[in-house]
Curated annotation (Swiss-Prot):
Lineage of source species: Bacteria, Pseudomonadati, Chlorobiota, Chlorobiia, Chlorobiales
Protein name: Acyl carrier protein
Pfam family, one: PP-binding
GO cellular component: cytosol; membrane
UniProt key word Phosphoprotein: yes
Name of the gene encoding the protein in the UniProt record: acpP
């Protein structure tokens, strides 16, 4: 899975879960500050990333995923 494929799917998940337009999302968008996620939204995003990509994201790692690029990098690394 390429970085671009992961990025596209991460963006799609954010659009679906957060109800924001794809044009509002940037790689450095913070889930809480820029995209309006609360703590429950963030947990749901992490769970959706786990389901979509077939990976496990431990809580200590999830706490470090604060923006879109963090999520993309983490998923790409786990899928290697």
């Amino acid at each position: 899975m390429t970085v671009d494929e992961v990025k596209g799917q991460v963006y799609d998940i954010i659009v679906t879960k957060m109800g924001v337009g794809k044009e509002q999302i940037k790689d450095d968008s913070k889930f809480t500050d820029d995209l309006g996620a609360d703590s429950l939204d963030t947990v749901e995003l992490i769970m959706e990333f786990e389901n979509k990509f077939g990976i496990q994201i431990p809580d200590e790692d999830a706490e470090k995923i604060s923006n879109v690029q963090d999520a993309i990098n983490y998923i790409v690394e786990k899928k290697k």
